[in-house]
Amino acid sequence: MTDAPLVTAELPGSGGSLRRSPEDFRVDEVPAYLPSGAGPHLYLRVEKRGRTTRDALRTLARALGVPERDAGYAGLKDKDAVTTQWLSFPAARDPEPQALASEGLRVLEVSRHANKLRPGHVRANRFQLAVRGGDLARAQAAAAALAERGLPNLFGPQRFGTEGRNAEVGRALLLGDPSPEARRAARDRFLRRLSISAYQALLFNRWLAERMADGLFATAVAGDVLKKLDTGGLFTCADPAVDGPRVQRFEVSPAGPMFGHKLRAAEGEALAREERLLAAEGIQLSDFARGGGEAEGTRRAARLRVEVALAPLEDGYLATFELPKGSYATVVMRELMKAGAELPEADED
């Protein structure tokens, strides 16, 4: 991630450090919908400190007397943080919140809904991050530039595993490599999905880095697949003179490739750019068919509108901002700090 492009590269970073104490790293999940108040599934909004989402699910399922496999969550939240999120359980009774409290875990709200929570049932995540020793004035200048220019929607380093090994295994799997690691990933659905998604993310980051290097980050190219940032709808750019200003106004964004055998195709110049990237990698779109349902492909917005609110602390500053699901706070903090921005984020995709 240290060699990933920056949209505020000419501005000095704030410096400072992001400590890993839970209180310095707060994440509030913004759900895709709120529970209706009625239904067979118990919904609990919880706050946790120093515990993973899976640990919280296990603890609460045991206390409620339901199988852990039947519990639901919308996204994984990291252990080294203070986080809030909704969890669901097929429980008949409504418990007292105090009765479910345990070390590092408390229940904030109790409700009900018709369906189980599932991964992806989240709209966004709201972050509050303390930067110790950071220069507030420098952070403010970078935040202002970021709000105007847009955030490159890059994947954070946690997506790729230790030293990028997950992505390497994903590429090997798609190419039919007979190595032991690739064969093991092919047999294990979780490892297969993890490895292939890491490789897809690596290719997306390279595609976006090339767009930025060529001055095409905040505009449209003929044949681009564009994404409406309010609804998520996709369409193909027929006239960059028409759609380019819409990109600049954050109405739409170029939608980069998460390559797969069912990927919506770009056209013209945009397609040629994607084909050159695959050729440089020595892989073809048809190779992704080896990944089956884990490698169908999709489109991801390349540029996001992000406004960072900054407040002074005695020894630094507090950064508050919201990102859509699947986007990484690490990317925002690199723009502000320029160094020392590694974050203990859980990978939710």
UniProtKB/Swiss-Prot annotation:
One of its GO terms (cellular component) is cytosol. It comes from Anaeromyxobacter sp. (strain Fw109-5). The keyword Isomerase applies. InterPro entries: PsdUridine_synth_cat_dom_sf (IPR020103), PsdUridine_synth_TruD (IPR001656), PsdUridine_synth_TruD_CS (IPR020119), PsdUridine_synth_TruD_insert (IPR011760), TruD_catalytic (IPR042214), TruD_insert_sf (IPR043165), TruD_pseudoU_synthase (IPR050170). The active site is at 78 (nucleophile). It is an enzyme of class 5 (isomerase). Belongs to the pseudouridine synthase TruD family. Its EC number is 5.4.99.27. This is tRNA pseudouridine synthase D. It catalyses: uridine(13) in tRNA = pseudouridine(13) in tRNA. Keywords: Isomerase, tRNA processing.
